[in-house]
Amino acid sequence: MDELRNVEYLPEPNEPRVVSAVDPSVSGFEDQWRSEVTGWFPTIVQPIKRVSRPYFLVSRGIALAILGAIVVLVWRFEWLIIELPLPDSEWAFEDSGIRDLQAMGLDGTGVHVCMVDTGIDLTHSAFNGRTIVFKDYVGGSSSPVEYGAIAHGTLMAGILLSQEHQIGVAPNVTFAMVATLQEDENGMNTGDESLVADAIRWCDQVFNADIISLSLGGMTPEEGETESKSVSATRQVTDKGIFVVAAAGNDGGPDDDGDVSSPGNVPRVITVGSHDRFGNVWSNSSIGNASLNLDESRQHPNMKPEILAPGVQIISAGEQNAWYSSSGTSDSTVFVAGSLALILQEFPQLKPSSNSNGSCIDAVKGALMNSTTTQNVAPIHDSKEGYGVLDAEKWYQEASKIGDC
C-alpha cells in the first residue's frame, strides 16, 4: 500500500488570506484513495463563556504582543484562534429542514447508524450521556478510541450525535463507530482499503445497520479494472436494502478526475456534495460522470452526485474537548445520513429486513430526487449540483407517499 505524502493547501472560502491544509483522512489503496475526500484541516475555535462585546481595551504593547503571537500561530500551525463566543452552524440545520423534522419529535430513535472513520473521542462534552457500539480494526481496543490526526471521526460523529451547544441531526440513533483509519508517523491519516470493506460488512452482519455513513472514499477504477473491495462490499449491502451514504469527494475544480469518489460511485449509494450557507455549490465538491462505464449510462435516481448538503465551515466536536470548523463533503454526508435516520424513524417499513432486495432504497432515492423539484416537473440533474439542495422536510413528505417496496 502506497501512502499519500503530499498535502495541498487551499484558501478558506470566506477568507482567501487564510490557507488551510487538506485533511489527510482516507486510506491510500493503490494510490487511489485520496486524502482530499474528507475535507480541509479544521480550524480550531476556542470558546469563551461570556463576552459582552466583540472587542477589548488593551495597551499598545499588549496589542502588539497579541498580534505577533497570532501571526506565529497561524504561520506555524495553519489554524487561527478565534477569541469570540463559540460559533455554531445552526444555519445548516435550519436551512436543510432538519430542525423542522426535529420539531415533529423525530430524533433517530430506533434507527441503527454505523459510521466508518478514524474512531471517536467519547469524552467530549458533546457526547455526554451517550453510549455507543465501537469496533476497532486499528488497535483492537474494546473501548472507544480516536486514532485520527485531527479527530476526523469525532467531528463527523458530533454533527450527528451532539447533545449540547448545537444539537446533532439525529442525536438518539443507535450508533456504532468502526475505526479503520489512523494517524501515521508522518501525521497523516491512512488505512487499508480491505479494512474499510471489512468494516462495511461488520456494520451489516454484526451491528445490523440501517444506514452506513462513509465520509471517505477513493478514485473510481478505470474501465476494465477489477472492482475494489470496498465497492464490492458496498454493492452487497445496498442490494440487501441497507442504505449507504457516502462523500462525493473534494477534488472539484480544474483538477477534478471526472467522477465522484468510490464507493460513492455505486448506483444505490446516496452520494453527497457540499454547498455553503447561501445554497451555492462548494467549488471543491467533486463532479459526477453520467456514465457507469463505456457501455452503460447512469439513470435516475442514481445520477451522481444525488444531492448537496451543508458542508462549508461546519462547527462540530473535535479533539481535546474543543469545537472545530471544517469544510468538505465529509460533513455534508453526515447531514444526509442523519436526515435519512429521521425519515426511517417515522417510516420504519422502509428499513432493511431479512427479505429486503434494495427496492426500498430505490424508492427513497426517488423521493429524494423528487424533493428537489416542483410538482409535474421532470427532474433535472447537474454533474456538480446533483438534483439540488437537501430539504429534509420535503424528502420526508415525498417518502410518506411510498407504499410497499
Q: Can you say where each PLM-predicted feature lies in the sequence?
A:
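Extracellular S/T/G-rich loop segment that most often corresponds to the catalytic His/Ser-adjacent loop
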Residues: 117, 261-345
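Hydrophobic membrane-insertion alpha-helices, especially the h-region
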Residues: 59-76
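Substrate-binding/access-modulating region of protease and related hydrolase catalytic domains
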Residues: 2-8, 182-268, 302, 319-333, ...
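Hydrolase catalytic cores
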Residues: 178-182, 311-381
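Subtilisin-like peptidase catalytic core
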Residues: 2-15, 47-55, 144-222, 273-276, ...
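N-terminal targeting leaders characterized by basic, low-complexity, disordered sequences
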Residues: 1-35
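N-terminal domain-start motif of subtilase-like serine proteases
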Residues: 43-61, 81-114, 138-149, 285, ...
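Subtilisin-like serine protease catalytic core
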Residues: 102-113, 120-133, 144-192, 239, ...
